[in-house]
């Protein structure tokens, strides 16, 4: 007797990719994620490739992973994919210290963020 399959976390014509620890603040990551929301997958990859933001590299990797998941795991058409969701949240916070003058120290906070990208297959509109 085998265990039943886990229910899908996204819809039938959708694929998902998640990065749990992206180094950088969620605010900065959300600025880049906002560039691709609602765009076609190919256009979104181009936007991220030529973006000057440092976080664009991490967002591009997650988007490429979501596209690969759609193609290989769910047999979706890559040319018809649209970025349905690009959500950002807080992850862990590393705490470090820096030495200061007169024997004192200061706390340094190094934030991490989570990124969840969902792509879906959009049907071509008949004209």
UniProtKB/Swiss-Prot annotation:
Keywords linked to the UniProt accession: Ribonucleoprotein, Ribosomal protein, RNA-binding, rRNA-binding
GO cellular component: cytosolic large ribosomal subunit
Keyword hit for Ubl conjugation: no
GO molecular function list: rRNA binding; structural constituent of ribosome
One GO BP: translation
Transmembrane segments: none
Keyword RNA-binding found: yes
Taxonomy, superkingdom: Bacteria
Pfam families: Ribosomal_L22 (PF00237)
Matches recorded under NCBIfam families: rplV_bact
Assembly information from the UniProt record: Part of the 50S ribosomal subunit.
Family: Belongs to the universal ribosomal protein uL22 family.
PANTHER family for this protein: CHLOROPLAST 50S RIBOSOMAL PROTEIN L22-RELATED (PTHR13501), LARGE RIBOSOMAL SUBUNIT PROTEIN UL22M (PTHR13501:SF8)
Role summary: This protein binds specifically to 23S rRNA; its binding is stimulated by other ribosomal proteins, e.g. L4, L17, and L20. It is important during the early stages of 50S assembly. It makes multiple contacts with different domains of the 23S rRNA in the assembled 50S subunit and ribosome.
The name this protein goes by in its record: Large ribosomal subunit protein uL22
Organism (species): Rhizorhabdus wittichii (strain DSM 6014 / CCUG 31198 / JCM 15750 / NBRC 105917 / EY 4224 / RW1) (Sphingomonas wittichii)
Gene: rplV
